[in-house]
């Protein structure tokens, strides 16, 4: 098909270098990870998000989508609702930010579930190889010698952004796939090729909707800067083709985009806007210095800073560093070229980086600061650098000295006098982590020294590109090992037993008593519920069911990127049907000191100590009383969990429609919120609980016997994607307790089925299914047309 064939200009010499680039990037990535892979016995673990989320998510979702765990739901629907994700969440919406649309994740489904922890490094190697290959294809257009395109691809793949974001893992998917889309845009603009751009738009959209928003903005900047520089002529036909393929690509990815958008719009973290001065300036001066130096110095570890004590720095992916040379090549290019589109693109990106409202435009105007879009200008910086290297007339050594001076100037942060406000004693330096700073500065200056030497000795010789490539790859390998090591061993005191706990959890999964209930953990590693395939109160993940983000805060429980209700909130355990709590032998005494009297020792299994909740209430129960949301919000926050064991919270509208089935809670009952009364409330709720409750991979099935018509409450996060069936008849679902669900059931023995399909999936699936034949016909037409032209 013509739409998917390289033009003659791209074949031959270029194709050989493409596979060389892929191989070199794969080899370099493998060498970076090899020491840690061997140290960890194949189960590579790093720190923070990589350990807590990425390993767990990849392994869990591999089994979930293959049907491991819970049975299919009502009507045969399956694999749409994950019980192990927080209190339960729609799978597509919870994981589309992390992996649901990633081609690398879907590739990993070829392997058994238990292999996944050991495949994290091979998958990362593959991602870096794909990143290098895509960057090579893009950069080949802008150099005469393909060896410099190989160099640029290495600069991009092993940039500071690439190494930093190993910590987040799924960000590397974005690094890998973006250059292919930019290459496809160039092919459309310059070669008038058809199909590739639509295809890569769809792939990048499916891969990560969050990053796709920023990619759209960057493509607009890229297109306008190139057009304004006169690098191509925009005709009505070209504009129409670009518009059509853009829309077609979005339509192909619409199956994931639309349900995710509907879910994300309910997430407070995505719609919290800044205002006033917050639009225009950062609140801390250090933020500006950090942004500027992040383009010059090698990156710190994601969770600790070398210099900065203020500003939003950690976990932001704030780095645009190019390995070995930093911005030395960029400065040489900048001085030599006039009216160049790449200079315009970088200038615009720098303005966007320094103005909060413009920076947040890459994330749909979210107020949280991130620099996770820097990988896109990094590709342009790599293009500028290799273009400068290819020009023998440019002075490459002088800019290296200028960048080195900027790096050396940061010693001021280490040498500035500081007087302690309390003791009045003087000391030197404001560094937050002197050891890491020394390592970063040493690599920055050392890289420039090697680069300066290579330029002075070999710039005018044919081996220049090969010497630079050797330097870039060697530097990337060494710095990559040190960078990962700083982050990994910085948390070694807490993460050294991570593999043991996760492996023990797999054994415990087989030894737990049968039944469908929730668990809680105390001072274990994150996301243990994903390894046990159980809904767990302790969960670390940004994109769980949005209603959780209203339910928990109403109880005074913080819910930002994790759910972590305090052990002291004992009533929450009864409300949410927690039956067992897990801790380790090392923390058993500490648990005894903190826990209420409602826990009794159950057993010690597979390295864990289990406690049973004496106030456990099976999931699905009824109430005698109700409260309005207004009354509920007027109560004291710390004891609201106790109150929810006594009365159901209804909206004003639902009180009108369903209040007849319950009695308004007497005023006197609002105050008796002691532990003793809580145990009685649990007994009352237990008496009306469902006789059967079965979790499914699409919701749940329940059976109950009621002496009168009543609202049956389920501590499952409300979601517009749920459909409820009572005795086979579709029934309205009530949003109660500011985020959970209830349904009206008649008197007698009833069966209840909740079935989940992502809200908006019917429309999104229809759009994508309609777009597929359009895409095939579109590309097929131009393939046939090209074939006819070749014959003649």
Please provide the spans of the model-predicted regions:
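Periplasmic/ER-lumenal interhelical loops and adjacent helix-loop junctions
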Residues: 52-55, 59-72, 239-242, 246-336, ...
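Membrane-interface helix-loop junctions at the exits of transmembrane helices
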Residues: 32-41, 68, 107-114, 147-169, ...
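Membrane-embedded alpha-helical segments of multi-pass membrane proteins
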Residues: 122-130, 172-180, 216, 321-326, ...
């Amino acid at each position: 098909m013509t739409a998917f064939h390289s033009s003659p200009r791209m074949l031959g010499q270029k194709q050989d270098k493409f596979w060389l680039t892929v191989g070199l990037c794969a080899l370099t990535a493998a060498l970076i990870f090899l020491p840690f892979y061997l140290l960890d016995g194949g189960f590579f673990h790093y720190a923070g998000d990589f350990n807590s989320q990425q390993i767990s998510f990849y392994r869990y979702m591999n089994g979930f989508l293959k049907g491991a765990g819970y049975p299919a739901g009502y009507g045969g629907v399956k694999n749409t609702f994950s019980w192990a994700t927080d209190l339960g969440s729609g799978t597509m919406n919870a994981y589309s930010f992390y992996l649901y649309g990633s081609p690398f994740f879907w590739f990993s489904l070829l392997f058994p579930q238990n292999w996944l922890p050991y495949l994290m490094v091979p998958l990362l190697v593959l991602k870096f190889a794909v990143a290098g290959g895509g960057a090579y294809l893009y950069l080949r257009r802008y150099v005469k010698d393909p060896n410099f395109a190989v160099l640029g691809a290495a600069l991009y793949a092993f940039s500071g952004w690439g190494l930093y974001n190993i910590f987040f893992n799924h960000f590397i998917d974005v690094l890998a796939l973006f250059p292919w889309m930019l290459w496809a845009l160039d092919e459309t603009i310059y070669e008038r090729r058809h199909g590739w751009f639509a295809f890569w738009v769809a792939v990048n959209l499916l891969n990560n909707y969050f990053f796709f928003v920023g990619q759209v903005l960057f493509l607009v900047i890229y297109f306008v800067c190139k057009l304004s520089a006169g690098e191509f002529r925009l005709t009505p036909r070209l504009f129409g083709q670009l518009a059509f393929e853009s829309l077609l690509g979005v339509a192909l990815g619409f199956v994931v985009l639309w349900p995710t958008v509907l879910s994300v719009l309910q997430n407070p973290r995505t719609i919290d806007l800044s205002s006033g001065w917050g639009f225009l300036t950062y609140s801390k001066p250090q933020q500006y210095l950090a942004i500027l130096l992040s383009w010059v110095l090698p990156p710190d570890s994601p969770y600790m800073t070398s210099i900065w004590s203020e500003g939003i720095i950690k976990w932001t992916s704030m780095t645009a560093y190019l390995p070995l040379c930093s911005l030395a090549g960029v400065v040489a290019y900048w001085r030599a070229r006039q009216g160049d589109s790449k200079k315009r693109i970088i200038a615009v990106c720098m303005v966007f980086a320094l103005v909060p409202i413009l920076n947040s435009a890459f994330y749909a105007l979210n107020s949280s600061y991130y620099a996770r879009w820097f990988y896109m200008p990094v590709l342009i910086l790599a293009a500028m650098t290799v273009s400068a290297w290819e020009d023998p007339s440019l002075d490459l050594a002088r800019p290296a000295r200028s960048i080195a001076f900027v790096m050396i100037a940061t010693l001021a942060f280490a040498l500035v006098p500081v007087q302690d406000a309390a003791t009045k004693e003087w000391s030197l330096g404001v560094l937050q982590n002197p050891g890491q700073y020394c390592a970063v500065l040493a690599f920055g200056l050392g890289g420039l020294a090697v680069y300066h030497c290579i330029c002075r000795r070999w710039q005018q010789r044919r081996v220049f590109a090969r010497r630079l490539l050797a330097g870039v790859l060697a530097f990337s390998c060494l710095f990559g090992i040190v960078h990962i090591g700083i982050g990994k061993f910085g948390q070694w005191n807490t993460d050294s037993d991570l593999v043991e706990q996760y492996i023990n959890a797999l054994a415990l999964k087989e030894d737990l008593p049968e039944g469908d209930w929730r668990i809680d953990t105390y001072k274990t590693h994150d996301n243990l519920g994903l390894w046990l395939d159980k809904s767990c109160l302790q969960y670390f993940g940004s994109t769980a069911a949005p209603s959780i983000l209203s339910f928990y805060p109403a109880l005074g429980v913080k819910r930002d990127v994790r759910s972590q209700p305090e052990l002291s909130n004992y009533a929450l355990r009864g409300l949410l049907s927690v039956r067992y709590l897990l801790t380790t032998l090392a923390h058993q005494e500490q648990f005894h000191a903190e826990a209420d009297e409602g826990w009794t020792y159950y057993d010690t299994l597979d390295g864990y100590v289990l406690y049973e909740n004496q106030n456990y209430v099976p999931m699905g129960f009824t109430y005698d009383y109700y409260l309005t949301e207004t009354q509920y919000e007027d109560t004291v926050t710390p004891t609201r969990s106790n109150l929810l064991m006594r009365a159901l919270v209804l909206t004003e509208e639902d009180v009108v429609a369903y209040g007849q089935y319950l009695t308004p809670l007497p005023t006197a009952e609002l105050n008796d919120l002691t532990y003793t009364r809580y145990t009685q409330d649990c007994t009352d709720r237990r008496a009306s609980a469902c006789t059967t409750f079965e979790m499914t991979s699409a919701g749940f099935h329940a059976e109950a016997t009621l002496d009168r018509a009543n609202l049956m409450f389920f501590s499952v996060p409300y979601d517009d994607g749920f459909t409820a069936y009572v005795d086979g008849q579709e029934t309205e679902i009530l949003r109660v307790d500011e985020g959970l669900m209830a349904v009206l059931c008649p008197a007698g023995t009833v069966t209840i089925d909740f079935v989940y399909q992502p809200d908006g999936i019917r429309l999104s699936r229809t759009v994508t299914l309609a777009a597929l034949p359009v895409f095939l016909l579109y590309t097929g037409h131009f393939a046939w047309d090209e074939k006819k032209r070749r014959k003649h």
